[in-house]
Amino acid sequence: MIQKYTYGTPFETDAIVTSIPTSEGTPAYGTISTENGFSFAYDMDDNDVVYGLGESNRGINKRGYVYESNCSDQPNHTEDKISLYGAHNFIVISGKQTFGLFVDYPGKLKFDIGYTLSSQLKITCEDADLYLYVIEGETPYDIVKQFRKIIGRSYIPPKFAFGFGQSRWGYTTADDFRKAADGYRENNIPIDMVYMDIDYMEDYKDFTINQENFPDFEAYVNEMKEKGIHLVPIIDAGVKVEAGYDVYEEGVEKNYFCKREDGSDFVSAVWPGWTHFPDVLNADARAWFGQKYERLISKGIDGFWNDMNEPAMFCTPEGVAELKEYIKDNFMDKEEAPGFTLGDKVNALANNPEDYKRFYHNVNGQKIRHDKVHNLFGYNMTRAAGEAFEKIAPGKRFLMFSRSSYVGMHRYGGIWMGDNKSWWSHILLNLKMLPSLNMCGFLYTGADLGGFGADTTRDLVLRWLALGVFTPLMRNHSALGTREQEAYQFENIEDFRHVIGVRYRLVPYLYSEYMKAALNDDMMFRPLAFDYTDDAFATQVEDQLLLGNEIMIAPVYTQNAKGRYVYLPEEMMFVKFLPDGTISQEILEKGHHYVEVALNEVPLFIRKGKAIPVADVAQTVKDINPATIRMIGYEGAEYDRYDDDGVSTL
């Protein structure tokens, strides 16, 4: 059962697609106050578990820390960070009482889950203008499925998007991208996509191509497609301020950019220099910006990734002026050294909270200050693209994922987990985010395999790939200036060929399970506790996940480990894809086990009485031969495999 409570005058986020009447009175759970903003307080038992919050730090059970829904350009995903790129305000409390909460509020929202008081869950925000949805069900899984029904169907990508992709910030010329593609093809390592970061553009201007590097971009796109490679360019949120740049001039002429309070176009520095932000919360501006994707689609592009759309800001003219004044007042003509405060002031120029209060959106003729609806920007930038795709190429699927998001964006694209680091702990963080994101409708997701920032290691890339084999988005991505981490850069390339090849062997299963989850408003990845509800120990397990209804995954995420401990809540078949192409299968009883997993092996566990389809390796998704599909798992088990043309919208 779902009940909706309305407080004040909420902003319509379009997160919910089902019409639900407002209930009278107050929720049956917790205590609500609307004095000095909004607060919800609930007393937890010691054994209560709290799930959800989508893309957020720490564990699957969110107890013991504080989190903010405040879409942030945050490249350091350490445990102290309380907000990342997304705002996913859905939680499920499981224990003495089991219920779910979705707080439909587009500004900054704080979840104190046993941080200030270990027994109290407290949700607070500045304004008492929101919708609160209270969902009751028998189990957390039941509650999630009810929530998924009211937020709409998850985005469905083209089938090629389930292949492997290579990316690196720093690829600039046609030869750079060609070298990456050829490096995989020449070493017989399967690949479907090469991603284009910001350097393909002319001066970092959206919807442009550097003509010197790509004199005939359409021919280049076709050249890559002949190799079985889809090029996937990045689009950023900021439009460069430059006379003669038509996107800029059109936006200014039609008042499609976010405004300062005085009505002038708001200015912020991002990659191109000074930029304006398209007012994607304005329906006309959103349609205008979305239509610009056609410029690249007309050249043969069929996939994009949206970035910097929290929106990220390096600085603003106002912030720079304030810094200059501070330096003048405190350090000019003075003999003493500046001290650390000057450094803090300089660092505070980027993504300064005060700057998010300096600009406004025009929504149905109403001027809305940005910080009040901050978490909707990335969502609506990707919505702009998704709505435009339906008009530009009706009936065709496009690959699309974003960095920033809010519940509702899951209908238009996926997300990647942002600028992680080449740290072993981030394999585990990647794993733990998967079910939380699925709870909020984000099925097409994955991390930068091998790590984006910092220098990676061969063993880290292999272990991370062995998790990435299972995530819908499987992409190796790294930052400018870091160690090159394409699979062909390391010794014993055959190990990478094998591990990535396992992905292609599993595509018949992974695509089928993704589509079942999308079409049935379900989860692809689940915590063990969602299925094994009577198993108290399963609630404690956070480094193993159920994938679909047939398998459990348990990656190795510790350097120098020869294997790992696993807990089996029932008898399962331990399966390893071995480097010689064979598959080992061993029945293990319910309970605790240590399993050996070499660096060049990919493990999974098949649940009792189940089986999954496995194909032969192919170099691209479209080259997977259905005639080679066979079943592995328990003898006599059946599997209902979903398939389609992988291109047409549903």
Residue ranges of model-derived segments:
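Extracellular structured ligand-interaction cores
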Residues: 37, 85-89, 96-98, 106, ...
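Short, hydrophobic/amphipathic alpha-helical packing segments
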Residues: 66-71, 84-87, 178, 286, ...
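Catalytic core of carbohydrate-active enzymes
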Residues: 38, 63, 78, 376, ...
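Short acidic-glycine loop/turn motifs at beta-strand connectors
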Residues: 92-97, 260-262, 569-570, 579
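Glycine-rich, histidine-containing beta strand-loop boundary motifs that form or position
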Residues: 42-44, 55, 94, 102-105, ...
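Aromatic- and carboxylate-enriched substrate-binding clefts and catalytic-loop regions
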Residues: 190-496, 531-532
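A residue-level signal for conserved active-site and pocket-lining positions in enzyme catalytic cores
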Residues: 90, 147, 184, 224, ...
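Catalytic and substrate-binding clefts that recognize carbohydrates or anionic sugar/phosphate headgroups
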Residues: 1-158, 168-170, 174, 181-186, ...
